[in-house]
C-alpha cells in the first residue's frame, strides 16, 4: 500500500466533513467490526461519511491515492465485503435518515439504515415495503442484492419497489438512476450488488401494512404414507 503523507491527508480532511480514523485512533477498532465477528481486516484508514458530498470526496481520494476501497452500509454481509485490509474503508453507517412522503407513499432512505430503522419510520404511518427478515440487516446491501422477505408474496421483491437511487460512481460522478434516467445503471443496481457505485439514497414505494399484523406457522399433515 502507498504510504499517505500528512499533506495528502490534510488536503483530504479540508474537503471532508465526517470523521477520519487511523489504526491508532480510539474508535478505529470498534468501527471496523461488523456483524460477522470472524472478519478481522484492518483498513489503512476509515472515513465515516455524513453526506453524499463526503462519499464523493472519499471516492475521489481513494482513486487519487490508488487505494483499495470497501464500502460499509449496515455491515451485515457474511463475507465481510464492508472491510478491506490496508485500504480505504468508506463507512456509511452514520447516514441513517429516513423520510416518508404520505401523499405519494414513498420513502427516501440513506444507506446506513438497517431494516429496523426503515420499518420503524414507515410503520409510524402504517406503511411498509418488502424488506428482509432480520432487523439488523442493512437496507443498502439487501436492496442491491435483490431483497425478499415477509411481504414479497404480496408486493414483490425489494427491487420491485425501488423507484430511484442516487449513486456515486467509481469515477466520482454523482448520478440519479431510475426507470427513465440512467436506466441501464438502474437496471444494474436492481440485483447487481455493489458493482456499479455507492448508493447514497434510495427511493422506495410504500404500501399500507398494519399496524396490527397476524402471523404464525401453518403446518400441513404429511401426504406420505407412514413407515
Explain the meaning of each model-derived region.
Residues 22, 128, 165-166, 170-227:
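C-terminal cap/substrate-recognition region of VAO/PCMH-type FAD-linked oxidoreductases
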Residues 1-148, 153-154, 161, 196, ...:
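N-terminal accessory segments
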Amino acid at each position: 500500500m502507498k504510504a499517505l503523507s500528512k499533506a495528502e491527508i490534510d488536503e483530504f480532511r479540508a474537503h471532508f466533513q465526517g470523521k477520519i480514523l487511523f489504526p491508532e485512533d480510539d474508535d478505529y477498532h470498534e468501527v471496523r467490526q461488523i456483524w460477522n465477528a470472524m472478519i478481522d481486516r484492518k483498513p489503512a484508514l476509515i472515513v465515516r461519511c455524513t453526506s453524499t458530498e463526503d462519499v464523493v470526496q472519499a471516492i475521489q481520494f481513494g482513486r487519487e491515492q490508488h487505494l483499495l476501497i470497501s464500502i460499509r452500509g449496515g455491515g451485515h454481509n457474511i463475507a465481510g465485503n464492508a472491510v478491506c485490509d490496508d485500504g480505504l474503508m468508506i463507512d456509511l453507517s452514520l447516514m441513517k435518515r429516513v423520510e416518508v412522503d404520505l401523499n405519494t407513499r414513498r420513502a427516501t432512505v440513506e444507506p446506513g439504515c438497517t431494516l429496523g430503522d426503515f420499518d420503524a419510520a414507515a410503520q409510524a404511518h402504517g406503511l411498509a415495503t418488502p424488506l428482509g427478515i432480520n432487523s439488523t440487516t442493512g437496507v443498502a446491501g439487501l436492496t442491491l442484492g435483490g431483497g425478499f422477505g415477509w411481504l414479497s408474496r404480496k408486493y414483490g421483491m425489494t427491487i420491485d419497489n425501488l423507484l430511484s437511487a442516487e449513486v456515486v460512481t467509481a469515477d466520482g460522478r454523482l448520478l440519479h438512476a431510475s426507470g427513465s434516467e440512467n436506466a441501464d445503471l438502474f437496471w444494474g443496481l436492481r440485483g447487481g450488488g455493489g458493482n456499479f457505485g455507492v448508493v447514497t439514497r434510495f427511493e422506495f414505494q410504500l404500501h399500507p401494512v398494519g399496524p396490527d399484523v397476524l402471523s404464525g406457522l401453518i403446518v400441513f399433515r404429511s401426504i406420505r404414507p407412514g413407515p
